[in-house]
Amino acid sequence: MLSYWLRAIRIRFLLASVIAVSLGLSVTWWNSGTIDIFQAALTMGGVIALHASVDLLNDYWDFKRGIDTKTKRTPMSGGTGVLPEGLLKPKSVYNAGILFLMAGGLIGGYFVVLHGVVIGVILAFAIMSIYFYSTKIVNWGLAEVFVAVKGTLIVMGTYYIQNSELTDVVVLSGIVVGVLSSLVLFVTSFPDHDADKEKGRRTLVILFGRQKAVSIFYIFPIISYGIIIGCAAMSIIPVFCLISLAAIPVIITSIRKLKSSVSDEDKIIPAMKSTLTFSRIAGALFVIGFLIQ
C-alpha cells in the first residue's frame, strides 16, 4: 500500500522542490553565513507537502476527466496509473491531496505569523494555484508558467523566511530553477498531447504542435543559463555557480533524442529521462555553486 501512495505522490519529482528550498538556503548561507535550522526544516516539510498535494490532486482530476484512461503510461508521463489500475480509491487520493494542502497551509500560516505579508502573498498564491491547477490553470495554457513561478516563489519564500528581505540575487536564482522545473513538465507533455487535447487541456505542446514545440525546448535552458552566465559575469552571483554548465552535454543529448522521437511515445522516453536528469544536475550544481567559498 505504501508503494502505491509513493507512486501517487510521484516521489521522484519531489526533488524539484527540494532543490528549490536548498537553493534559497544556499543563497542565505552565501549571503550571511548562518541558517536557522528549525525554520529551514519546517520550510522543507511545508513545501514538500504542497508539492505532494498538487500531484495527488492532479492525479485525481486527470482520472475524473478521463485523461489517464486515454494516455499511455510511461515512467515519466501519462499519470501514475494508481487510479486507472484500481490500486487506490479516487476519493482517498483526493482527500490525501487536501490533507497535504492543509498541512502545507498550516506550516505556511505559521511563517505568515512570524514574517508577515510577503509570505502571506506567496502562500495564498500557492494554495489557490495548487487547488485550481488541474481544473483551470492547465486549461488556460498556463501550466508551464505556473511551474516556473512556483519554483521561483519557493526560492524567494525560503530566503525571506531566513532573512526577512528579498534581493535581486534570490529572485534571479529562483527563476533559474523555476524554468528548469518547467522544462521537465514541458517535455513530459509530448506523449500526452492527444489525450490532453481531447479533454480540453492546453499545454504549450498542444498550443504550438509537436514539431514547433521542439524549437521552444531551447528557450528553457537558454533562459536559465543566460541568467547564470550574465549574473556571474556581473559578479551578482558567485563565479562558482558556473559549474552548472557541466550539465550542458546532458541537455544536448536531450535535444537530439527529442528531435528524433517527437511523435513516438516509446522512443521519446529517453529524451524525457535525460531532460529530468539535466534539470536536477544543473539545479543541484547551481546550489553547490553558492556553497563553495
Set out the residue ranges of the language-model regions.
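Multi-pass membrane catalytic core of lipid/isoprenoid biosynthesis enzymes
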Residues: 72-112, 205-236, 276-282
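Helix-coil boundary and interhelical linker segments in multi-pass alpha-helical membrane proteins
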Residues: 25-45, 105-120, 155-175, 227-240, ...
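Membrane-embedded alpha-helical segments that form the functional core of polytopic membrane enzymes
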Residues: 32-57, 120-121, 125-131, 169-187
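Acidic (Asp/Glu-rich) catalytic motifs at the cytosolic membrane interface
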Residues: 49-74, 183-205
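Topogenic membrane-insertion module of multi-pass membrane proteins
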Residues: 1-38, 42, 46, 138-144
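Extended hydrophobic alpha-helices typical of membrane-associated regions
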Residues: 236-293
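Small-residue-rich segments of transmembrane alpha-helices in multi-pass membrane proteins
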Residues: 18-24, 146-160, 177, 206-210, ...
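Intramembrane alpha-helical segments
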Residues: 79-168
